[in-house]
Amino acid sequence: MSYEAHVTDTAYCYDGSFAGFLCCVFESYARKEIPAEVCPPEEGQLNFFGTRQIFTDEQHARRVAAGLDRLGREVKDRVTTGFLCTDPGKDLTLLRFVRLCFAQGPRAAQMLGDPDAAAAFALERAVDNEACRLIEFIRFEERDGMLGAVIHPKHRILPLLRGHFCSRLPDENFLIYDAAHGTALLHRDGQVRYLSMERYIPGADETELDWQRMWKRFFKALTIEQRRDEKAQMSHVPKRFWQDMCEMQPDLAFPAGADVRKAD
């Protein structure tokens, strides 16, 4: 295919940022080549490929970004959302898809018979699907005077959660901590920031724990033990999400003297 250019045995290594990825696209055009691999820092590099370090140049990144803007929303969303995927090899997949789009125009997003277009579509769908599911199952709790939630997603989905929660909780201060990737989405006083975090220290206070105990009792009261089907449950709520859902955790003991009524 004409958009492939010359395939080399060189791996591009870059800083892992989206701007850095756009610079890899720029370098690919400047050298009229397709790299054998595109490696962010977390993936390292394969020893049997020669390597070329691609440094982030904001001017180069802006030129490629402007080109994506001209290709339309569908193409741009596929690239930006697909970039949040953590599957190995996604960087090279997206670079090849961008080249296809520049060669074929916006219609390339619909060319799912092309392996590069199909692979980019699969990346976008994987990220979107996980974000949609987590929107339903995120559990906030009161932590250190604000709402806090911990998640362990496979992909870096925080940017896709931003619009949903900021529009529905505009007057709340909240933090969503992605423990799998060490990042957090902070909404405070109407402003949004992304933070790097190694851990989320503040724990739930006793009032919050009381609410969690009551919610767990309510959840348990609705359960019909004879009809429990864990396989069906996992088909609706993947088990990897359970660790962040209070109702799926072991029972919390009520403090001494608490007014505990049996849930029938």
Q: PLM features: residue spans?
A:
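Conserved aromatic-histidine-acidic binding/catalytic patches
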Residues: T10-S17, R52, P115, M146-I157, ...
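Short coil/turn segments at secondary-structure boundaries
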Residues: R78-F83, A179, R228-M234
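Internal, well-folded beta-alpha domain core
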Residues: R107-E198
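N-terminal ordered "arm"
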Residues: S2-E58
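Acidic, Ser/Thr-rich peripheral helices and adjacent loops at domain boundaries
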Residues: Q53-R62, Q191-A204
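Short, hydrophobic/amphipathic alpha-helical patches that form generic packing surfaces
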Residues: G20-R31, L95-A103, G163-S167, R213-K220
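Charged, alpha-helical interface segments at or near domain boundaries
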Residues: C39-C132
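Long, compositionally biased intrinsically disordered terminal regions
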Residues: N173, A184-D189, R199, G203-D264
